[in-house]
């Protein structure tokens, strides 16, 4: 590594000479030039072209010339050394466009520790893929274009084969500890083999073993962490509060890392080597294997801390424009990607990917016709805001997480398709505490093992070019939806880690006929509060856990009733119009209706409240509600099968009929229908008995 001299701020007695160009400087004889002679070069190729510099003669220097910071006049000994204030400039290497590759100049400046900032003032071309271990450096391309046509071939499956790849050093040896005691969630004190090896301020790659019985890559912890305190001989504190609990006997592996730090890349327009080439994977002309070798992308970081990227605008890149793995504390802002060669090849066509990353902020980014705008894999405590992906109906979803135990991720003010933890069981399909606010899209899928999912002001709008159903799929494990809208709502249950209630409030949905809203595995309470449902026709709740509707508006099409298999169905307040509520009696069930609820209209079953002939006993608890039938043949209550324990008091019925079959109140069944108000109601009920009391009502 060659270290150039910084221009001294103190006055010098050495006279400063002047020459028009670098060529004239190098053509001048140097045999009699005194040591320390300063020369002001007015331009690189022509005076005033921006490539001018001040150089100093060092008669003892033997460093190889690099056409910029070290100028070789052709002598065995003696070099002109560029003086600078820590800022490097490609023009001072004679580069003013894309005619010549800028790779050698880039290497010279990055590998010079005296240079802390590198600037581009023209378009540039790079023909090689560069790997650096370098910190405290800023590269600013000034909004100019970088091209890479004909760049050297990449290696197989290598998203780190970027033009700029900054990588920290990872030790070759690791230390593993078997936990003697459980490691609780939110712990920042970790058990280690010997804390004497862990100095305060050192960085470590920390990995858990594979989840017992889990998938091949299923690990809850893979992060780059810094030691903040030595607690005792076998414990240290890290700068991270653990997102997942570990039982005693689980293993943690620690590998020391010397990260690259404070490297920032800014303001570049990047044209991928295969930009504009048709994707053979899509059109059937062949597999896209060749593209991973010939394609190009600008930036990759690995084992990096506080390395930021901003103002990168790429077209036609193969691997992610900004690729990160094992990164902690970073920002990616005001970047974009247009038209990558593929959206169907896994790992390709991304704007930014983060693997094993922590404390990241991705903001003000755009993607067009890409696979992903942002992918968070095995990452935590990251914020994605004001990012927008268009062209997402062609095969890519702008926002995704892998499902490799991500936790505490927040998305705010974004738009574009979004799915969570959806990459497959090999990685665990698990995530925790994902919060999404103010998001617009035409498809949302979060139906895997996602715990404590929070959605606020999220809107799924059906779009004929991608998902006409406007799908909204979520997991009932601490689920909280507030102020959301969608079309097809599907709620499942793939995990049961949370103690938080499942609540959908102030939301609106309009599912197609026959939609299964509550799936079979849901065995916990599910509450809908102040929600609006439109187009109800044959909807199904197959779940077994209780379901509550509080002050909800349900509008039907006078089609098939909504069927429920839930153990408890509780209706408090609200309005149900042209829709029937029918219990399947597949198990013992309880229906509670009250709180001023209103049922009104008719439906295909000609019954507003009814049951099927399943083997379960249905307990009916009806009070303080109103039922208005719009046709004389529509029943407010139709109970004609199975075992029933019926109680209705304080209700109001208008028009229609009430139909009870004697067989539905045999054996241990009973009915108490009393102190109600009935107006123009036709009764079809058996005579009263010691188990059937239908008197003491006010009838008109």
For each of these PLM feature ranges, what is it?
Residues 14-34, 91-121, 125, 193-201:
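Acidic Gly/Asp/Thr-rich repetitive segments characteristic of extracellular carbohydrate-active
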Residues 15-33, 40-43, 48, 147-233, ...:
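Autoprocessing Asn-cyclization modules and mimics
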Residues 37-42, 92, 105-129, 137-148, ...:
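Glycine-rich repeat segments that build the extracellular carbohydrate-interaction surface of secreted
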Residues 59-66, 116-117, 128-151, 229-231, ...:
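Beta-solenoid repeat scaffold
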Residues 128-130, 148-152, 274-280, 317-323, ...:
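Short glycine/acidic-rich loop motifs that flank beta-strands on beta-rich extracellular proteins
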Residues 138-142, 263-265, 307-311, 329-335, ...:
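All-beta strand scaffolds that present successive hydrophobic residues in beta-strands
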Residues 202, 207-231, 266-373, 379:
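Right-handed parallel beta-helix
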């Amino acid at each position: 590594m060659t270290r150039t001299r910084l221009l001294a701020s103190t006055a010098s007695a050495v006279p400063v000479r002047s020459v028009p160009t670098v060529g004239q400087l190098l053509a001048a004889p140097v045999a009699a030039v005194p040591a320390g002679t300063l020369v002001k070069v007015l331009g690189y190729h022509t005076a005033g072209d921006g490539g001018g510099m001040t150089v100093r003669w060092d008669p003892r220097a033997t460093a190889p010339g690099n056409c910029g910071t070290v100028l070789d006049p052709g002598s065995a000994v003696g070099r002109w050394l560029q003086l600078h204030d820590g800022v490097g400039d490609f023009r001072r290497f004679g580069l003013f466009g894309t005619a010549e590759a800028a790779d050698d100049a880039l290497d010279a400046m990055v590998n010079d520790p005296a240079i802390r900032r590198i600037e581009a003032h023209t378009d540039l071309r790079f023909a090689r893929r560069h790997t650096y271990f370098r910190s405290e450096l800023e590269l600013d391309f000034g909004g100019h274009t970088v091209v890479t046509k004909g760049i050297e071939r990449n290696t197989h499956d290598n998203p780190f084969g970027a033009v700029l790849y900054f990588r920290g050093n990872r030790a070759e040896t690791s230390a593993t500890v078997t936990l003697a005691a459980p490691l609780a969630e939110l712990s920042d004190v970790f058990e280690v083999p010997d804390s004497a090896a862990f100095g305060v301020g050192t960085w470590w790659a920390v990995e858990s073993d594979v989840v017992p019985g889990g998938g091949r890559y299923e690990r809850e912890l893979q992060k780059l962490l810094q030691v903040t305190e030595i607690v005792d001989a076998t414990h240290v504190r890290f700068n991270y509060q653990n997102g997942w609990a570990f039982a005693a006997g689980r293993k943690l592996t620690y590998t020391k890392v010397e990260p690259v730090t404070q490297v920032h890349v800014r303001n570049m327009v990047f044209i991928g080597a295969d930009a504009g080439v048709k994707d053979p994977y899509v059109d059937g002309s062949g597999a896209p294997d060749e593209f991973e070798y010939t394609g190009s992308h600008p930036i990759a970081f690995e084992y990096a801390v506080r390395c930021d990227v901003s103002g990168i605008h790429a077209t036609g890149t193969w691997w992610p424009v900004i690729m990160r793995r094992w990164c902690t504390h970073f920002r990616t802002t005001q970047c974009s990607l247009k038209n990558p060669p593929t959206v169907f090849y896994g790992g390709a066509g991304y704007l930014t990917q983060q693997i094993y990353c922590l404390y990241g902020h991705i903001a003000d980014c755009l993607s067009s016709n890409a696979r992903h705008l942002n992918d968070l894999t095995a990452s935590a405590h990251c914020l994605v805001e004001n990012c927008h992906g268009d062209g997402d109906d062609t095969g890519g979803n702008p926002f995704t997480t892998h499902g490799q135990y991500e936790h505490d991720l927040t998305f705010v003010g974004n738009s574009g398709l979004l799915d969570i933890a959806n990459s497959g069981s090999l990685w665990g399909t698990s995530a925790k505490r994902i919060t999404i606010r103010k998001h617009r899209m035409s498809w949302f899928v979060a139906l895997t093992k996602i715990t404590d999912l929070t959605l606020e002001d999220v809107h799924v709008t059906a779009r004929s070019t991608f998902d006409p159903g406007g799908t909204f799929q979520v997991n009932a494990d601490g689920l909280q939806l507030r102020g959301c809208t969608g079309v097809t709502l599907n709620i499942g249950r793939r995990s049961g880690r949370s103690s938080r209630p499942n609540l959908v409030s102030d939301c609106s949905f309009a599912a197609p006929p026959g939609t299964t809203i509550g799936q079979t595995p849901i065995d916990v309470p599910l509450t809908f509060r102040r929600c609006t449902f439109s187009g109800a026709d044959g909807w199904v709740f197959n779940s077994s856990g209780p379901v509550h509707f509080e002050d909800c508006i349900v509008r039907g099409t006078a089609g098939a009733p909504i069927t429920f298999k839930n153990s408890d169905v509780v209706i408090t307040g609200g309005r149900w119009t042209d829709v029937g509520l029918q219990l399947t009696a597949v198990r013992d069930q309880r229906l509670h209706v009250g709180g001023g609820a209103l049922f009104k209209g008719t439906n295909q079953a000609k019954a507003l409240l009814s049951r099927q002939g399943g083997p379960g006993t249905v307990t009916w608890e009806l009070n303080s509600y109103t039922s208005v039938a719009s046709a004389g043949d529509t029943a407010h209550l139709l109970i004609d099968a199975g075992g029933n324990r019926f109680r209705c008091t304080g209700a109001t019925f208008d028009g229609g009929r009430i139909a009870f079959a004697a067989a539905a109140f045999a054996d241990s069944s009973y009915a108490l229908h009393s102190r109600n108000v009935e107006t123009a109601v036709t009764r079809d009920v058996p005579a009263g008995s010691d188990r059937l009391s239908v008197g003491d009502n006010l009838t008109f």
